[in-house]
Amino acid sequence: MALSHRLELRQGQGLVITPQLQQAIKLLQLSNIELDAFVEAELERNPLLQRDEGDHEPAVEVEAERDASLTQVDAVADTTAGRELDTPVDDVSPGERATGEGTDAEHAGGQIDWSRAGGGGSFESDEGYERALTDSPTLAAHLRTQLVQAALSPAHNAIAEILIDAVDEGGYLRLDIVELADRLGCALALVEETLSVLQGFEPVGVFARDVRECLALQLKDLNRYDPAMAAMLDHLELLAKRDMAGLRRICGVDDEDLREMIGEIRSLNPRPGAAYHSEPAETLVPDVMVREGLGGMWHVELNTDTLPRVLVDQRYHARVSKGARSDQEKTFVADCMASANWLVKSLDQRAKTILKVASEIVRQQDGFLAFGVEHLRPLNLKTVADAIGMHESTVSRVTSNKYIATPRGVFELKFFFTSAIQSSEGGEAHSAASVRHKIKGLVDAEKCEADVHSDDRIVEILKAAGVDIARRTVAKYREAMRIPSSVERRRLMKEAV
């Protein structure tokens, strides 16, 4: 076959993502702190932008019904703008990104390299994301990885998220669990059960409320926590004073045993969380606020304190436009004007989109707001996206690094999403975490060899309860919870007898 050169003209359709639309999409996933920093950089770069120092307008507010199926929130008036911002860019090719017609890989919550944030809003560098990959994990991230593997029920998982946020850099829990139970409207025993699970996480000793509990957790892990050790931990002040006679008397041991005990105590780590990368503490400011109104309605509104307010200085634009002489000066003024107008529009779209998504989440999870953490419903991104007519990727960006203040506390919007398993009777779906909780409950109820359930038997019991689940799924959940097989459980019971 002969090779030859020729020209062809082809017509086709393709997705074109301009740098400006790229910027608008990126703004969606920024936290209010990151957004404020970005706007500040734009104010310094663009002379036509100025901060609006006037009085804030009343917060945009919508109402959500308690019954999620009754009404649909109409929070965004500018539907055309909303559709622009909702462009699904997840499948744009690397080649398009290189030419500025695509967008870089979407990583919800990824770090932005602010040194490259100017120039019309192009985010072409992944340096910040690459740096994040090489950084050592934070203590909170390490704990959340273990939380996923723990396969807790929705209620326990929700409480665990709050407890993780309350752990300081040393690994200590800085939260009163009695107050937490009261705030969440749940039994104290539920919080205590969750804390007990979390105290089994690595590093050993994490989630302790004081030094004594921290050391006790580590000794229990080493199988060295006995009455003598408990007595020593109850009188650590004597150890600090080096009152050996007092310790011998209280612990009931001789000199040799006492020396061994002290050596073991000194080998422990009183700050188990210190080995992990720590983040500077930041004040948590909610992006959205929800309060209960009359007639079973929930009022959802934006927190105007977190919304950067910028204006285009039209007078200054007119003045510099008249003074522009060269083509380069005129181009610069035109670019600044276009960039300023787009930023103002993008910020408005961002605010409306956040409100729309948050309102739907409130309607879906009204049970949690009204009755407490045990009433969290199974919810995923697709459900919210379909309800408000947006793309899943948009909902994902909106819920990253955004917080909502509720009567039960401040939560990240992603807190309200839990997976589900379909009902065998066609009814409401079951949370996957709640199914794992049911499996654990069945195993915990086994008292003798005859009570031990095989995976097949567990499937039968769950199907009788309306949960449609396969045997391999039961086995997967059981293994994730580190529950031995039925054969192993029978053997352990026989040995215990």
Curated annotation (Swiss-Prot):
rRNA-binding is among the record's keywords: no
Motif (RPON box): 471-479
Keywords from the named record: DNA-binding, DNA-directed RNA polymerase, Nucleotidyltransferase, Sigma factor, Transcription, Transcription regulation, Transferase
DNA-binding region: 380-399
Region (Disordered): 49-128
Entries under Gene3D superfamilies matching the protein: Homeodomain-like (1.10.10.60), RNA polymerase sigma-54 factor, core-binding domain (1.10.10.1330)
GO biological process, any: DNA-templated transcription initiation
GO molecular function, one term: nucleotidyltransferase activity
Gene Ontology CC, one term: DNA-directed RNA polymerase complex
Keyword tRNA processing: no
Sequence ranges of Basic and acidic residues compositional bias: 49-68
InterPro entries reported in the protein's UniProt record: RNA_pol_sigma_54, RNA_pol_sigma_54_core-bd, RNA_pol_sigma_54_DNA-bd, RpoN_core-bd_sf
Family: Belongs to the sigma-54 factor family.
Record PANTHER family: RNA POLYMERASE SIGMA-54 FACTOR
NCBIfam families associated with the record: PRK05932.1-3, PRK12469.1, rpoN_sigma
Biological function: Sigma factors are initiation factors that promote the attachment of RNA polymerase to specific initiation sites and are then released. This sigma factor is responsible for the expression of the nitrogen fixation genes. This sigma factor is required for the de novo biogenesis of both flagellum and stalk, and for polar morphogenesis and normal cell division. It may not be involved in nitrogen assimilation.
Protein name: RNA polymerase sigma-54 factor
Organism: Caulobacter vibrioides (strain ATCC 19089 / CIP 103742 / CB 15)
